[in-house]
Amino acid sequence: MFVYGSIINPCPTEHVMSVLAISITTVALAEIGDKTQLLSLLLASRYRKPIPIIAAIFLATLANHALAAWLGVVVADYLSPDILKWVLVVSFLTMAGWILIPDKLDGEESISTRGPFVASFIAFFMAEIGDKTQIATSILGAQYADALSWVIVGTTLGMLLANVPVVLIGKLSADKMPLGLIRKVTAGLFLLMALATAFF
């Protein structure tokens, strides 16, 4: 059973780096072409104030993913390590297929008329609910319950890695990005991650 003190207890450096790398990579790849990345582009184009938008993305992701990872830990109490391993494999395979499906926002009306920080925080937090990056965070939390804080740090950094450049180049149109090719490459990487998890 998960012991909540493990959130802050030190882990071996090698394990921490492994969890951090997997968390960053998984979420950064899953975020490519995702609706929250498109939301970042929309927010940047609308407000043209990158600092409050990036701060809002950071805090919204931290809050959302902390909750998601904790829920994953709760589920992990009822699953064996072998089952968790194959849940992770299946999740990577699912991501490989999911990433190939173009995502879109529900509409600009979902963006608040408040200031850039408040509007970005609310919009980003709500957009993450049920999103594939949130689901991935829950699964990672279940798999690496002994290093939960590093899962949260890694998934948050992964979101920033994928979204900060989009905010900074918000003047560019998403139509000019080779999203089709990017999605295919990303799907291939998720497939490799699934194979590596299953057999190594």
Curated annotation (Swiss-Prot):
It comes from the Bacteria. Induction: Induced by manganese. It is a multi-pass membrane protein. GO terms for molecular function: metal ion transmembrane transporter activity. Keywords: Cell inner membrane, Cell membrane, Ion transport, Manganese, Membrane, Transmembrane, Transmembrane helix, Transport. This is Putative manganese exporter. Involved in manganese homeostasis. May function as a manganese exporter. Disruption phenotype: Mutant exhibits sensitivity to manganese but not to other cations. Under high-manganese conditions, the mutant accumulates high levels of intracellular manganese with a concomitant decrease in intracellular iron levels. Mutant also shows a small, but significant, increase in resistance to oxidative stress induced by hydrogen peroxide. Belongs to the GDT1 family. GO terms for cellular component: plasma membrane. It holds the Pfam family GDT1. It comes from Vibrio cholerae serotype O1 (strain ATCC 39541 / Classical Ogawa 395 / O395). The chain crosses the membrane at residues 13-33, 53-73, 81-101, 110-130, 150-170, 180-200.
